[in-house]
Amino acid sequence: MYKRQHHYCAALADRGYVVFNINYRLVPDVTVNQQLQDVARALRWIRDHGSQYPCDMQNIMLTGDSAGGQLAAYSAVLMQSAQLRKTFDTVNPQMELTALLLTSPVAFMRDGGLFSLYTKPMWGTDYKDKATYPYMDFDQIIDYAQALPPTYLITSSGDTLANKQTHRLYEVLQAHGVQAEIKDYAKAEYNQSLPHVFSVLQPFEPAGTAAIDKALAFYQQAMTAKVAQ
């Protein structure tokens, strides 16, 4: 899920995938709650209209970067929890995911270190008074999901905004038995500290291309494993 990351979507489509680019309203005009509502409605639309496109609706990968990674991760849980959908006031997309691809996700806002600066803009100045207050960190909602899909996470040495958050999310997923893999690109790999969400911002550069290829290989493995079940 990306605000206007057309180049990244094009890079995915160039590899033969059908790509739906979900545009959601942005803070400070709305909060995370309303963004999740936008995403859920968009996913419902994809479910209802996907047959009009040359895509396999039985093998969907949901992806997002940075705050969009948070929305993707949260949406995956909300799909499996009527209780949380009621709390966040979202529709049920009635969709099953084969894989998640999260690039530098920001999934810990209640106790998110550096990202705590963005808590009020993203969740609202009255966030402590909302029904969603107990669910602002991903480890507070993961138990509401019966079985999250295989998840691939990307970060890098220059990802000062979300490197720690990405590793923390990976550890939470591992602790809850989710098949998860993380790729943290070190400076030595490309002789530079790759920045926050580099594969999304620079999908046609060597590092971005390699990162996308590895992530999609994970997706292909998830599809193969699903067929074998």
Q: For the regions a protein language model found, what residue spans apply to each?
A:
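Alpha/beta-hydrolase superfamily serine-hydrolase fold, recognizing
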Residues: 3-229
